[in-house]
Regions:
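Single, function-defining residue in the core of a domain
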Residues: 1-34, 41, 57-60, 70-73, ...
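Active-site-proximal, Lys/Arg-enriched surface segment
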Residues: 47-116
């Protein structure tokens, strides 16, 4: 796949890029994040390969490299949490219990930018009940850490989160940092309260009828503390309404959330095809380094795979690949049935060498512009 060509764009030296590309190629072959599996897929002695991978992980700041994949043309940034189970890791320090209170594992919060219906990762943090003391307070701090990690990159862009993030402490942090946000409201067993006034004397009940157009509440107090805008819709076919909390204009917040809802988050392919949930590291430091490398590998493979999908299933000319806009296809087209990464890993050999070279050349141009901007 000529990963080295892409690696040279984001790594500081050609020598480092060469090492990284060998490891990333092996990750795709192994379809595994485990160093032993990766070393086995590399040419040469497996034991020597294993040590080389370990040295590489120790020496490189892969989180910094991952941030270079931030798409500056993105309108918004997505926060996407997932649970990674580690049922056998009883003595691993960073592993705690997941939301069911029993299963061993940890949380991974990934920040990503949208790219034609896909999520391109650019930052993440890991945390668990074992790495924090007070669950509510520390969860807030970990979520803040994720945002703080790329705050300079985010700039004026809006951050979009799901309902796990609609709690007061996190919203207050975003407000202090003057970050624009759109967050789905958690309407669980204990929904948050809203008030017309900061003294909490006049409570407001969110109400909307099925099929009713957007219901908007402007400048109301969330938990009686923070001024926010709230917008709700209840569309036919849904059991309950969708409520959005935002510091944007309500209509704009709803528009952005609807765009986000059409985007495939990255964890389905990361777990299903690259088996990221099988990651095994005793050290949290090495865990985060290998996860960063997996995300970098995924991002490059995603771009190439999406181009292959367009060429093979939508009959796009290889030199006319456009990863910013999806091709025009019938709803019955198989283009809608497969992800680009699936085609790259499972069906790449069906392309002739010339076509594959043209695809990679086109994708490299897109990748270069993604990293450095269009006008470099």
């Amino acid at each position: 796949m000529q990963i080295e060509k892409f690696a040279k764009v984001i790594f500081d030296t050609d020598r480092t890029a060469k090492k990284a590309s060998k490891i990333m190629e092996a990750v795709l072959k192994a379809k595994s994040p485990r160093i032993s599996d990766v070393a086995d897929q590399m040419a040469g002695n497996e034991a020597a390969n294993y040590k080389m991978v370990q040295r590489f992980l120790k020496q490189e700041d892969l989180q910094e490299v991952l941030q270079r994949l931030f798409n500056e043309e993105a309108e918004f940034v997505i926060g996407d949490p997932t649970e990674i189970e580690r049922p056998g890791a009883k003595k691993t320090g960073y592993v705690g219990t997941l939301s069911d209170g029993q299963t061993k594992g940890f949380w991974m919060l990934t920040l990503a930018t949208p790219l034609r219906g896909r999520a391109l990762p650019c930052h993440f943090v890991t945390y668990s009940s074992a790495t924090i003391n007070d669950e509510a307070t520390s969860r807030n701090l970990e979520h803040q850490r994720a945002v703080q990690g790329i705050k300079a990159l985010i700039g004026e862009r809006t951050m979009v989160f799901d309902r796990e993030f609609s709690y007061l402490g996190f919203l207050l942090k975003l407000d202090v940092e003057q970050i624009k946000y759109v967050i789905r409201l958690n309407q669980g067993s204990k929904p948050p309260k809203f008030y017309y006034d900061a003294r909490q004397k006049r409570e407001l009940k969110l109400k909307i009828a099925l099929g009713e157009g957007p219901k908007i509440y402007r400048q109301i107090y969330y938990q009686g503390v923070l001024l926010v805008n709230v917008v709700g819709v209840w569309e036919e076919g849904f059991k309950s309404p969708l409520w959005i909390i935002t510091n944007l204009e309500p209509e704009e917040g709803l528009r952005i959330y609807k765009l986000r809802s059409k985007i495939e988050v990255c964890f389905r392919d990361l777990k299903g095809l690259l088996h990221m949930d099988k990651v095994m590291n005793k050290s949290r430091t090495y865990l985060e380094k290998i996860l960063a490398l997996i995300l970098i590998t995924y991002a490059i493979a995603l771009l190439v795979g999406e181009a292959i999908r367009d060429v093979r299933l939508a009959r796009v000319e290889p030199n006319k690949v456009d990863l910013h806009n999806p091709p025009v296809t019938e709803k019955s087209s198989k283009w809608h049935s497969f992800s680009g990464l699936f085609l790259l890993l499972k069906r790449r050999r069906r392309l002739d060498a010339r076509t594959l070279w043209q695809i990679i050349h086109a994708v490299f141009s897109i990748f270069f512009n993604l990293v450095f901007g269009k006008y470099v």
